[in-house]
């Protein structure tokens, strides 16, 4: 059994960071791929929701999703939040002895009980369990931003999913922060780098 870990929302200006872990046998993960599962960016939102439901409902698949709020990201930093989430996932599935993380770093994390702990560049394209984790994390991020869009409709969260699109940046310039935004994140405008002020709330 292999545990794949991936995240969604790392580069967003608003909302939580979601880190997901999916553990299952390789043959089962390959079956999902054969049925059309791909890494999250290659799937529509509707298909991500559908696959996430199938992953979480399957009796032979173990999954964990950890959310780190915008407040936690502002107070601890994104890297610390990501490391904490990875620890929570790995330690929450102690029977799993092989772990692959999407990316190029293990963040100097060490788990003595693991037989294998690897960072895989473009792992969501190469390791089915990481692809499954990417879908699960992104589906949770999508759902969060749909809900936040209802609370703060001026920012277009349901469409931009919290990323710094042009329309999102324009809305920030007009309305300032909402309580859902990460106050510590910088924005790259057309003309300059600027840091939003925490007191500029919706």
Segments from the language model and where they lie:
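RNase H-like, Mg2+-dependent phosphodiesterase core
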Residues: 1-202
């Amino acid at each position: 059994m292999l545990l794949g870990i991936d995240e969604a929302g790392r580069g967003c200006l608003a909302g939580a960071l979601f880190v997901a872990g999916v553990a299952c046998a390789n043959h089962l993960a390959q079956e999902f791929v054969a049925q059309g599962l791909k890494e999250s960016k290659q799937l529509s939102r509707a298909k991500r929701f559908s696959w996430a439901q199938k992953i979480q409902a399957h009796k032979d698949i173990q999954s964990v999703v950890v959310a780190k709020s915008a407040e936690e990201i502002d107070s601890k930093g994104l890297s610390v939040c990501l490391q904490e989430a990875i620890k929570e996932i790995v330690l929450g599935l102690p029977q799993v002895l092989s772990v692959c993380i999407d990316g190029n770093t293990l963040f100097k994390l060490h788990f003595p009980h693991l037989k294998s702990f690897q960072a895989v560049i473009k792992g969501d394209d190469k390791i089915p369990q990481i692809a499954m984790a990417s879908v699960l994390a992104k589906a949770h991020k999508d759902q969060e931003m749909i809900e936040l869009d209802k609370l703060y409709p001026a920012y277009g969260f349901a469409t931009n999913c919290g990323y710094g699109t042009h329309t999102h940046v324009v809305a920030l310039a007009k309305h300032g922060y909402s309580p859902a935004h990460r106050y510590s994140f910088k924005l790259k405008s057309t003309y300059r780098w600027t840091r939003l002020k925490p007191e500029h709330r919706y």
